[in-house]
Amino acid sequence: MAFNLKNFKVIVQMGKSRGDQSANGSTNGHAVSLKEGIQGFLQNAGVGNSSKFVLDEKVMAKLPSDFREQAEQFRHLGAYVSKLPVEEIGIPEYLGFVSRGSDTQQKRNLVYPVGGGVFIHVVHDPEDTRDYYLAVEPSLAPGVEEIVNDIDVQLMDYIDELRAADGSEERLEVILNAVDEICGRADSSSKKVSKSVDLTDDQFQAIKYLMRREKAGMGVMDPLVEDPYIEDISCSGVGPLYIEHKIFGGLKASIEFSDSEELDQYVIQLSEKIGRPVTIREPIVDSTLPDGSRINIVYGGDVSRRGSNFTIRKFSATPLSILDLIKFGTLTYEMAAYISLMLSEGMNTFVSGETAS
């Protein structure tokens, strides 16, 4: 298969809402995005012909020991790497930990973990100044999209338990326990399960991941929100999401909105997730995510020439100190001393600059 970086593109297919509702009250139209790029690439390369991931022993043997260990433990990563055109782009460098000194490659081709079985592949795009940022998720398991729809229907039988749950974490626990029962992975005599869903281990882990991502997380954007190295996520309209990365600078995500209808629908669903729904009467929303990140959402073309858009500005779990800023080259010791004097004297100050500068 000829390698084309555009094969990795993930078009966010919100799908047409069927008008039905999932067990947590949300519409099923966006429960699972159709990863036409990455998943299609894997399927066309042979991974999707079975119900489990296929690992290429020759490629696996070429991986460094730490990378191979991760690829064997997280089989979706192994399958992903197995189908990469390594003869053309080479074996990705595996970084167990990303630091300021990690950006050493002239043509980036590296993988790092962000937790929860999610890995990020940063790969050079010779046609653009921004390289690709690709999320390798457990949900790449073949055949899971149809299975999710079946499970969503059966989750309706657990509506009473979900209503009785106290808070989002308890609701997620109810959903995951229900999935265990539906998939025959729990010892239960429950009569709620009308038809047990038969899954491989790869598919089961993918389903559990998707349930966490879609029911409690940020959906298709969840890997970006969970990545501690991302400072800014922006969608300026139809087209790809853009990222400001703490280490690798400006990148473009493998998530793209192909038309304004898809984007409008996603913006509405995103605003509902944070409890501040946008409407025609209230098209602009400023809010915060559970982790403290700021989010700005603009809905529709009446208030924005490019239509709906949104920006997520993330915050570091550990705030940067003044010494960190000096180390990173943001300012000099003399500048830091001058700022200290201004603050001690109660002078008015302002700081300006572009995002992620």
Which ranges hold each PLM region?
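N-terminal accessory targeting/assembly segments
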Residues: 2-274
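P-loop NTP-binding catalytic core
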Residues: 235-236, 240-348
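The conserved Walker
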Residues: 354-355
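Hydrophobic anchor at the beta1->P-loop junction of P-loop NTPases
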Residues: 351
